[in-house]
Amino acid sequence: MIIKILIADDHTIVREGLKQILMDTSDMVVAAEAANGQEVLDKIWKDDFDVVVLDIAMPGRSGLDILKELKSFKPRLPVLVLSMYPEDQYALRVLRAGADGYLTKESAPNDLITAIRKVYSGKKYISNFLAEKLAFGLEADAARPPHELLSDREYQVMCSISSGKTVKEIADELSLSVKTISTYRARILEKMGMKNNAELTHYSIQNHLVD
């Protein structure tokens, strides 16, 4: 059985690199590519794939939103998230959102192949580091950093603010009102125990949540 894969990443060089890695396997084929979240949804509506390899940080709609919509439409379609973010910052969030596995872009090529085969077989793929974190219950609220207590939307807005985007830009990007984004901002500051955008940005940089 050949595993049909949809690769979703906004960087052409990354997609080409992934195709080169998978080209050497006898049981996988890259059946389609997508450069943004909407393309991902369009392609899974029109065709059937065995695994989606999804970059969580593409332009446009939030990768978490795309993941949730994809899973609501095809709940049994395995999704392996491939991300530049360290797994201790983002993996638990995407797994809770429905991802079947999480891999950083710094991982070895063999890890990618192993992960695809594992999620295709119906299992979850996580690293040994993350498995230990889950096993010891370090995701419990008391031990989690403040940003992990935010909702997915709050987290998304926080990262956008920390990246220097204005409330208007974030509202346009998420198709929400300026008032709604301002409400999210106030809620984020309260939950994080911070006073302004500068403190949020400093925190996000310290915790490697933004570039």
Predicted regions and their residues:
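Short, flexible helix-to-coil linker/hinge segments that flank and couple to helix-turn-helix
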Residues: Q89-R96, G101-D152, Q156, L209-V210
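Short hydrophobic/Thr-rich beta-strand motif most characteristic of the beta2 strand and flanking loop
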Residues: D27-A35, K43, M194
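Active-site beta3 strand of CheY-like receiver
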Residues: D47-V53
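Helix-turn-helix DNA-binding segment
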Residues: R144-K179
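Receiver (REC) domain active-site loop signature in two-component systems and cognate sites
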Residues: I56-M58
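Basic, Lys/Arg-enriched C-terminal extension of HTH/homeodomain DNA-binding domains
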Residues: L189-D211
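Acidic catalytic/metal-coordinating carboxylates
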Residues: N36-E39, S62-D65
